Amino acid sequence: MRVVGIGGTLRAGSSSERLARAVLAACEARGAEVRMFDGPHLARLPHFDPATPDRSPAEAELVEAVRTAHALVIASPGYHGGVSGLVKNAIDLLEDLRGDARPYFDGRPVGLIVLAAGWQAGGVTLAALRGIVHAMRGWPTPIGLAVNSIEQKPFDADGKLADAGIAAAVEAMATQLTQGVHPGA
């Protein structure tokens, strides 16, 4: 089973990236092969242009990883109540999967993570990601993770999950991702 993570910010080791990596680590502990496309990787992607079929090596690598994934994790900051441009550009690139026998995220579980400075931005951004995943024929996991970065501190000084509720949600999401994969997926 392969689980691919997409997300983060331009800052390596951002909280959204670290939460995605925590979910991937929990999936790996359940036997999955995992791969993360973090913010610095996503920053190398040119702006998506559907009229240009040629892809850079970084673009082709992301598209192929998602094409062969059994499940996905997408993590975004909730900038002003929306998905970051960095993450949205990566999602838009997956339009290249439209002609596949299994287009887009067809039938695959997708875990969604949002970190935002407030509950409203986090909830709205999580809802937007759920809508995107539905439009791309995927199945958002029942547990979605919206973290209020003002009121919640997911990690301690050593970088370990420090919030019991967030840690439980990470484990629940990993279970839903790995158990939501169907044979032949």
Question: Which residues make up each language-model segment?
Answer:
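Mobile beta-alpha loop/short-helix "lid" or hinge segments that flank ligand
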Residues: 35-47, 103-104, 108, 136-157
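Residue-identity detector for glutamine
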Residues: 120, 152, 176-179
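N-terminal beta1-alpha1-beta2 submodule of the flavodoxin-like/Rossmannoid cofactor-binding fold
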Residues: 1-100, 158-185
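Short, glycine-/small-residue-rich phosphate/pyrophosphate-handling segment
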Residues: 106-148, 165
